[in-house]
């Protein structure tokens, strides 16, 4: 047994998990359950009443958090302690949205001052592009932005830009490129005019394979349209810490925005990585995004565990993964603008908590990060919701919906809400055999067939869900929502005693990909790897099967 599983609270939860009643019974026992098990913070309301949890469950979960020293770990992250122990780094994405007067010291430097300088630089740049002062090489204003990145430098800007579509200023269009598949960038460049296109390249090292390959192809396209090398500076900017490589590429040093080691890619949209967002919605809205996240930071840092929204969500996820063998978690967004959030949260959670070794190098003997997946309502109801209702796997769900739509036409939004709330009720309540049979009472079917069909219409219920509501989707509420999931991810990793801020599996994939690339471009067939890899490489070299 590991240190975690030996904790008294862990062992108490293991015993308690076998005695929790069906949620139908819990709602009968606790008529005021919604009032007792919902909380508001930062413009969000969390209803967690539809969980397999009694008051005793909550007490035990918070006891585990306290026994795991969660509060101390939260404070250590905010203080800039080196909690990323495998890379010897602080973890300070929270500093990216801290107010100007905040002081956070990293190796003798107040990083908040550096962040504010970068935000001011972004503001000047965004203003020059959106007002038309920034001119392309033929004197025309910029109309299109192509954002080139991968991972966090792609997903964050893309999903936030998509979510904030109602706040676009209208001066620019933005196109996001990540995949190294040439089709991706070719399709994005179709119809663009090199004279009015600005490229934003995001890579800390200015050497990430996918990002550099796509940027070089973008540059080739740009030059092929009649531009020259000296024109590159008017159409390419970078977010990178490698100024030398960026300037060698042709980017003006004044148009290189910094990145820092204390920010991981999946937590970086709040930095200059978010430049495409700012170009689309303006710096005022970008700062509102930061303000919403900062408000959630304060809530996470200062609120007691029992009413702390990220803690509640993180502990429930752990509850199902470790004591009910839940292997996945679904995020369901009932707002079209938020349709990309499940993919963003997927990277955030799975890259952070997809670990099997504790901070001190011990193999874990408990489940860690679940598979995160999902989509937008109501589309999912006609696809995978069937599995949620009647499948054999337990899949906890998060439902996310604004109470007010940006596009309130006809009965659309009330129907959307009815589906959202109806799904949470159906998952919790289910349908018994007697209820299903009663529904068939007026049918002319023979009794034997009614019995058969009723059996197929039974739904066990007791399927847990959280519901997150906001008055309206705004930059502020979006910032708070994303920060909520960041901190929820931290809570789980802190309890599991893993490092949520490295990604060695990703690094191995890069390394082996480069090894294979060498063999794909070699003069002779591959013979030195396993037989499967050798065969696949050689088939590719032959261009046929």
UniProtKB/Swiss-Prot annotation:
Keywords: Cytoplasm, Gluconeogenesis, Glycolysis, Isomerase. InterPro entries: G6P_Isomerase (IPR001672), G6P_Isomerase_C (IPR023096), Phosphoglucose_isomerase_CS (IPR018189), SIS_dom_sf (IPR046348), SIS_PGI_1 (IPR035476), SIS_PGI_2 (IPR035482). Its EC number is 5.3.1.9. Gene3D superfamilies: 1.10.1390.10, Glucose-6-phosphate isomerase like protein, domain 1. GO terms for molecular function: carbohydrate derivative binding; glucose-6-phosphate isomerase activity; monosaccharide binding. Pathway: Carbohydrate biosynthesis; gluconeogenesis; Carbohydrate degradation; glycolysis; D-glyceraldehyde 3-phosphate and glycerone phosphate from D-glucose: step 2/4. It catalyses: alpha-D-glucose 6-phosphate = beta-D-fructose 6-phosphate. The active site is at 351 (proton donor), 382, 510. GO terms for biological process: gluconeogenesis; glucose 6-phosphate metabolic process; glycolytic process. GO terms for cellular component: cytosol. It is found in: Cytoplasm. NCBIfam families: PRK00179.1. HAMAP family: G6P_isomerase. Catalyzes the reversible isomerization of glucose-6-phosphate to fructose-6-phosphate. Belongs to the GPI family. This is Glucose-6-phosphate isomerase. It comes from Shewanella piezotolerans (strain WP3 / JCM 13877).
